[in-house]
UniProtKB/Swiss-Prot annotation:
It comes from Agelena orientalis. Residues 1-20 form the signal peptide. Residues 21-34 form a propeptide. This is U2-agatoxin-Ao1l. It is found in: Secreted. Keywords: Amidation, Disulfide bond, Knottin, Neurotoxin, Secreted, Signal, Toxin. Pfam families: Toxin_7. Disulfide bonds join 37-53, 44-58, 52-68.
Length: 70
């Protein structure tokens, strides 16, 4: 009987925590997660997403440094 009551209390607490977070907040994604583009002078990788914004290209400045430049 105690186990059932404890389980019900834990379920109620978890549900109240989930309801406390607004739905819109949980759906907001960062620019990178949405597959957006990278602005000027940001680190990039020409072989993987996200890509540089239109008008910019991922230019290799050295072996370890590539940036979105115009």
């Amino acid at each position: 009987m105690r186990a059932i009551i404890s389980l019900l209390l834990i379920s109620a607490m978890v549900f109240s925590i989930i309801e406390a977070v607004p739905e819109e907040e949980g759906l907001q994604l960062s620019e990178d997660e949405r597959g957006g583009c990278l602005p000027h002078n940001r680190f990039c990788n020409a072989l993987s997403d996200p890509r540089c914004c239109s008008g910019l290209r991922c230019k290799e400045l050295s072996i370890w440094d590539s940036r979105c430049l115009g």
